Amino acid sequence: MAFAGTMGKDKEVRFDPCWSQEAVLVVNRLHPLAAYDEISLDDLSDQHLISYNLTGPLGAELTNLVKDCDLAIDYLYSDEITLASMVVGNPDMMAIACRSWLLDSFDQDIKLVRIKEAPEAFHQMYLCSSALMRHSKTVDEFIDIVLDYCSKSLE
């Protein structure tokens, strides 16, 4: 079992939606754009941007988000911790990332700026489990508890 995104349908994996993540611009607090709460991708054409590797679970969503924009983005990274670390280390660099609790530990050094073009539910997260094997009662109860919790948090 895992909480993860999806790379598409897989007959061996059961994907139960749990929550979604918003796409944000991760900005070093020393950068002038840290004064903004929201920004358009069109305003970033002359900025140094980084984001996730397009071969990972965010590739389709990220490609769709920026498809109509003339942006220079280095698609090299696999997680929010690395993206935030790069932005902290270089105030001129910004990252397009999913809003995640992992970014909270960088709060003193970064600002998360909403991206106008990004849907609120940019990236769907799932509780993933085996679709082929029978689960123990404990695992089934855990799945039920998680899905119940997730459904209530979405209300």
Predicted regions and their residues:
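Extended ligand-binding regions for polar small-molecule ligands
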Residues: 42, 126-155
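Active-site-adjacent beta-strand anchor residues
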Residues: 26, 51-52, 77-78, 95
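Beta->alpha turn/N-cap motifs
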Residues: 1-8, 28-29, 80, 96-101
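Short beta-strand-to-loop elements that line the ligand-binding cleft
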Residues: 5, 71-83
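Flexible hinge/capping segments at coil-to-helix
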Residues: 11-23, 27-49
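Secondary-structure junction motif
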Residues: 47-69, 99, 103, 135-143, ...
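Beta-alpha-beta core module
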Residues: 11-22, 36, 82-132
